[in-house]
Amino acid sequence: MTIGRTILVVADACGVGEAPDAARYGDLGAATVPHVAEAVGGLDMYTCGRLGLGNIVPVEGVPPAAPPRACFGKLAEKSAGKDSTSGHWEMAGVIVDKPFPVFPRGFPRELVQEFERRSGVGVIGNVATSGTEIIQKLGFAHLETKALILYTSADSVFQLAAHERLYPPERLYEICQIARELLQGEYGVGRVIARPFEGEPGNFRRTRNRRDFSLVPPHDTILDLFTKHNLRTVGIGKIGDLFAGRGLTDKVKTENNRDVAGALIQAVEETDYDLIFANFVDFDELHGHRNNAIGFARALEDFDLAMEEVVEEMRPDDMLIITADHGCDPTMTSSTDHTREYVPLLVYGRQLASGIDLGTRETFADIAATIADARGLPHQFPGRSFMKDITP
């Protein structure tokens, strides 16, 4: 059996329960989607429910389907991390054995000085903190001095915030590219992130012009495999940033989940891409990191409506895979960090089997192996394909 198009959808940060090694990451008890459902008294997710979301784990308001329209299971992350880069790379076939470096006390002085020398711009801050908080705290000083606001977090990130009046987004992106070229080896953070903001003192707010500058994957991903076989790929949302553009025929820039949904539905309706890879980021960026369970719940319900349209527009030989890259449990208010969790796995296609329990998978890389097998492409991805399980 050969699949036509694969539609890979990542509900960013939508974990479904603590991973076996959650204690190592300080995440015992995390369960993003189930806890969000509990916090609002239940979710209205008819489409994902019919596909089998409630068959993976108990989710209030989403009962187990009998039988589910999709095959279902959950995946554990094998990579050393709980960030978007390692999560997406792993599902694309690259396991990160060594965690990306983190800098909880800020970046070394000599590194910052070299960045200032190369970029020609000074920095202030250089602390691990919340991005929304630091622009309120240092925004006025930034306007006065024109120094960029540098900060990091519990993730492996080098973030540069700048007011768009002083540094238009394209200029900030140029500076971030300089940082990306510098930050390699022992300082090779997973992502350099441009964080433009606007407003006046006391009312600074981020704009939607964020851009991520990822490391380049060390090995070929499923995207590279497709393009090497002259198959067309498109990345929607932050996919292009996470893979440094590699292996993508086209990229669609979006600002929020609504944009992603529109671009995804259009791609499914109108295009002949062989692999459509989309990331819905709002769960993470707007809700998980801000401990906003109510907003997270509403975003999940909107996501479900988008999935309804995707399912309706799928062609007979399409394969839809819905998953996540990590958790970010907004009910764990002692932290705003990502959480080490299992992620959901829903696999649907009109010509595929339905109602098959795919079990607990050992690595996200099972997705890459399956997508390759679905197109009959030879590969050496570390995952274990479930293509035979979903073939009638």
Residue ranges and their predicted role:
Residues 1-392:
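Feature captures the catalytic ectodomains and active-site-proximal regions of enzymes
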